[in-house]
Amino acid sequence: MAKKWVYLFTEGNANMRELLGGKGANLAEMTNIGLPVPQGFTITTEACTQYYEDGREINDEIQSQINEYIGKMEQITGKKFGDKQNPLLVSVRSGARASMPGMMDTILNLGLNEEVVNVIAEQSNNPRWAWDCYRRFIQMYSDVVMEVGKKYFEELIDKMKADRGVKQDVELTAEDLKELANQFKAEYKSKVGVDFPDNPKEQLMGAIKAVFRSWDNPRANVYRRDNDIPYSWGTAVNVQAMVFGNMGEDCGTGVAFTRDPATGQKGLFGEFLTNAQGEDVVAGVRTPMKISEMEEKFPKAYAQFKIVCNTLEAHYRDMQDMEFTVEHCQLYMLQTRNGKRTAQAALKIACDLVDEQMRNEEEAVAMIDPRNLDTLLHPQFDAAALKAAVPAGKALGASPGAACGKIVFTAEDAKNWAARGEKVVLVRLETSPEDIEGMKAAQGILTVRGGMTSHAAVVARGMGTCCVSGCGDIVMDEENKKFTLAGKEYHEGDYLSLDGSTGNIYDGQIPTVDATIAGEFGRIMGWADKYRKLKVRTNADTPADAKKARELGAEGIGLCRTEHMFFEGDRIDAFREMICSDTVEEREAALAKILPVQQGDFEKLYEALEGNPVTIRFLDPPLHEFVPTEEEDIKKLADAQGKSVETIKAIIDSLHEFNPMMGHRGCRLAVTYPEIARMQTRAVIRAAINVQKAHTDWNIKPEIMIPLVGEVKELKFVKKIVVKTADEEIAAAGIKLEYEVGTMIEIPRAALTADEIAKEADFFCFGTNDLTQMTFGFSRDDAGKFLGAYYDAKILENDPFARLDQTGVGKLMEMTINLGKPVNPNLHIGICGEHGGDPSSVEFCHKIGLDYVSCSPFRVPIARLAAAQAAIAEKQN
């Protein structure tokens, strides 16, 4: 039996997301529960994958099924493609299994040609509407299918409006729009070299190909990488009978949410435009009216719409984002999906759904994207400074948060300025999906047009970027990179501050303060802690970082990098003296100066952690990182050591290495300079003794971590120094103190010989930054130069330094556990690379049985939530 590539809406349901994509599955589900949905069919995600396998062509079998289903659609609707009496017009929309707002392409009014336009103009007695549909179709088809830029058509529209002395598209007459359609076709021919296609089936195949092709466009690829959506999923294509919101004042189109996507507040929230079509609301071409105003215009349709909203939220048990059209006062539902929301809204909605008995605690925890918590923990404006500030303008607060930066006018400039360390605010007439990388780079986004559901608003909310939209008071001059607001001219590089919660726009810079976390955060985190099995620690080198991490729920320090402490104040001078010493005695004298300050640092960390575990990594970087490079500093070091400048320079030159990341660093330093390991051990143990004496109810148990071990004899050598020194200190203090000595697993050989190393180690901690570097053979510092090409060539989908490579590096981790645990059942194992705060990596760590993950302080809540979700998912499976 031939494979099924196409499904009518009546043949699917909500559980078929993988095959029909989110939009197709939900259109089928809405059809099944009896909602007013214009009928159509879905071409599966498998057909998209097949399209790429067949060299970006739709094969005969799939084309044949599409034609068969056009016939079925004609029977259902009673209309025919290209018919002179009753023509069928359709929309063609993408629909991946994960929602990707604005990332892929849509075409409306497909099936039109000049003959059909004349038929529908006469039948409807509304020639203006007919020609409006046709000019829109030509523009969309040219842009999406033939890649003729929208701007050429926008210029023609602007010229037409200027010639006619009008401001809005809706003010153009039927004759104007007919003339515009002919101008558009001429523009198409001048750019493409052939006439605009008249055959509806040819149009349809072109549109379906274009949607499949858009799965691989740059903005979709960036969005997928950022949101962990595999390339292999593909997108479905939905072909749906058109309904028209642009047939007159008794028609309209809108987008609505069942709860406020910015705050989570229950209640209908959205926007509506009369005499408009499809993308008009989202595209921000006209600033729309509030959804509540629809009640006055279309009381019957609005009453029905409210019932539909309640039905859908109860059915999906989540906040819904819906698109709809009203045609001659009749309501039609075009889409529903679980709505994108801010982090604050996500927490409130999850808690409210539990309180409303629509969800249980585990489901509430599983609903929240851990990555979004990042946005909760970032600064807001200082309240006093904000009170004193006078807004220069006000628009819609489309995505909460505070942003301050220098004004830029293009996405490209935003990206380039941010790359050189500038904080920028991107100011645009309106954003489009092409602006995605610039939007990511910006601190905040300000648009002149568009509402709360415009592209800028939806994408900014998803990214957690502050956004203010629809500031119609701005007079924009993009060409000269300036705008005027409230009588003042702003130029590129001027400072601007945005409040994404209130929509206020401020001249200049307003200082920011750390965010305060709402009560729902505590509830969700409490539930997460109840269900997770993984412990969550933090990577912290200072008491301030440790304190912040504890506030955010860290249960210990998984990595304290001791080398960071050497750079503070005048201690770097003593460390440089140690490096440039000729004898062990000279080195020990220099280290003696460092010992008390390092001990003091450790005491403060133990105090901040209140008896929770602290893992201290001994010196790791190569020594050349600590030596001076400035002439003045070299002279100062020479004077301090009583040596000539030439001698110091010779020592510095001798430290140069061709491949320092694999050179004289980590445990190799302790082997060549055992006195460094002795000093660090004394500092760790003396600090622990002092804090234990001061807090007898705490259980201080230092964890000393030896870096870069690849051979068990290295660990034995350094461990012997540590144990001898530690035991001497403990005996001298006359106190009972336990400590552990473990190692980082960051060299592939350590993973391969983990059974030998486990006999000597009390714990393992995966240093996945170096383990990734050495497994791939990629330099962490240089990979950025070629990773972009790897993404484009589909060699890699994600940055392996940000998201754990589970296939290769992950296999080494599993091997380490399987070799180490049988030899040493008490061995505890964690991870302290950057991956410790990445949700998909945390899920993998849970799956392979790690005891803890460790991440930067602000990512602790992300790790806590991701760990809970991993445990809940495992239980459900």
Please give the residue ranges for each predicted region.
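Protease-associated
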Residues: 358-441, 504-510, 521, 525-528, ...
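Short beta->alpha connector loops at strand-helix junctions that form conserved
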Residues: 41, 448-450, 469-472, 560, ...
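C-terminal domain-closing interface element
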Residues: 334-336, 491-539, 545
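Conserved alpha/beta-domain cores
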Residues: 93, 517, 527-877
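Glycine-rich phosphate/ribose-binding loops and adjacent secondary-structure elements
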Residues: 329-332, 429-440, 444, 452-458, ...
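Nucleotide/phosphate-binding sheet-loop regions of phosphoryl- and nucleotidyl-transfer enzymes
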Residues: 1-388, 422-425, 432-437, 443, ...
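Structural motif
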Residues: 238, 408, 425-427, 446, ...
